[in-house]
């Protein structure tokens, strides 16, 4: 019999700073994440999900599919994003998961009107930073505020703007329930509120390690069990997170980044 700690999937990272690595995600990692999101994003039996994401990363393969499956709601799956087809489907769905370019392309379509969106409960964005101007333009266009969230291959979803409450452009919101986030310096010391450092995380969503790479796995975790994301971030006094870049992609000039 399979248990929560048994490996359910190996999903390969994008390999931003080297060769791609196979992140081992357990049944517990995936189920805990989906159940948390179903509650956090308020899914009910009345929802219908529109899914036009590619299924080679966690957003499309796990987050969207698992939320629909575990809540038992219909999902309209499109093999690829097409503005005209999304517009045709919108009248029969209540939730859409997308990436920022989906929303900019929709706003360019003449048939994507404010009236078309009035029944929509939620537009979710992730997988790439949502520009503040896109957030504001979409609200002006539709009257709906996109909910931005943050995740990665090694932990699926990690943080989210609130369903109820203020969604601030340029931020990814707060740690998911059960997930602990901290922003640290190179010695893994927590930085002061508002200062930039590397985002670290611990929780039931965090993967079991990299496939056949024990040394790499060990180097990516702190002694107290936090995964070192490699993403540079800030956190305010309320715990709201802003992603500002990648650790290894920073350009240092005159000692400043």
Regions flagged by a language model, labelled:
Residues 1-12, 19, 42-48:
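Conserved pre-ATP/AMP-binding loop-to-beta segment of ANL
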Residues 31-48, 56-95, 105, 109-111:
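Conserved AMP-binding/adenylation subdomain of ANL enzymes
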Residues 8-32:
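Conserved AMP-binding A3 loop
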Residues 93-98, 107-168, 180:
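Gly/Ser/Thr-rich phosphate-binding loop
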Residues 21-24, 51, 73-80, 147:
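Short beta-strand->loop structural element characteristic of the AMP-binding/adenylate-forming
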Residues 7, 13-16, 49, 55, ...:
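Conserved S/T- and glycine-rich ATP-binding loop of Class I adenylate-forming
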Residues 127, 151, 173, 231, ...:
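Active-site glycine-centered loops adjacent to acidic/histidine catalytic or metal-binding residues
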Residues 189-194, 198-257:
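Conserved ATP-binding/catalytic segment of the ANL
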């Amino acid at each position: 019999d399979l248990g929560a700690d048994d490996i359910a999937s190996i999903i390969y990272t994008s390999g931003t700073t080297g060769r791609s690595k196979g992140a081992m995600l357990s049944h517990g990692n995936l189920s805990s994440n989906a159940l948390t999101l179903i509650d956090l994003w308020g899914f009910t039996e009345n929802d219908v999900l529109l899914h036009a994401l590619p299924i080679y990363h966690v957003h499309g393969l796990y987050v969207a599919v698992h939320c629909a499956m575990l809540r038992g709601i219909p999902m309209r799956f499109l093999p690829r994003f097409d503005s005209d087809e999304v517009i045709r489907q919108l009248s029969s769905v209540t939730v859409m998961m997308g990436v920022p370019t989906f929303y900019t392309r929709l706003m360019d379509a003449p048939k994507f009107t404010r009236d078309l969106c009035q029944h929509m409960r939620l537009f979710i964005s992730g997988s790439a930073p949502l520009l503040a101007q896109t957030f504001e333009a979409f609200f002006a266009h539709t009257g709906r505020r996109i909910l931005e969230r943050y995740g990665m291959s090694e932990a699926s979803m990690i943080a989210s703007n609130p369903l109820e409450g203020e969604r601030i452009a340029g931020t990814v919101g707060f740690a998911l329930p059960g997930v602990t986030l901290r922003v640290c310096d190179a010695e893994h010391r927590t930085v002061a509120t508002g200062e930039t450092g590397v985002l670290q995380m611990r929780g039931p969503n965090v993967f079991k390690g990299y496939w056949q790479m024990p040394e790499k796995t060990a180097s990516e975790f702190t002694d107290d069990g936090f995964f070192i994301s490699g993403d540079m971030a800030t956190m305010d006094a309320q715990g709201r997170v802003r992603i500002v870049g990648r650790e290894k992609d920073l350009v240092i000039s005159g000692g400043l980044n």
